[in-house]
Amino acid sequence: MILISQNITNYDIQIPENAVFRINLAWVNSINELKKLLELHKAHDIFLDLPINRTKPPNNRYSLEGIISILQDHNNVKYLAVSNVNKKEDLDEYITKIPKNITIVPKIESSIGVDNIESITNKLEYKERIIMLDHEDLYTDLLKL
């Protein structure tokens, strides 16, 4: 998978046809802006990053309930990254509510999440399981040990 950040749009760089376009909702200011981004990149599969319990700026403005209709209306959203997954139970609400055509990607940002990574991945019922490790937050947490 070639995963391209939304930051690439700040430069005059062509997005490869087979790339998955990542949109981090921490950097999207409104639902209307998200809809425009999804429409602009409708030719690409989308990896949507939903920051939950984000403590550093910019703070997340969205909840799962707030984006469910977006997920249902945009078939090109193929992945949803969920921040701060520390244990398998953190995924329960997402597994229940997210459309089945979207792959949930747990984002591990703490040593607790690393310790529970096997049970977290086993909770996912996909042929291919994807985990995202947040290098900055995870590194900061590991330094505290």
Regions found by a protein language model. Name each.
Residues 2-145:
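Conserved alpha/beta-domain cores
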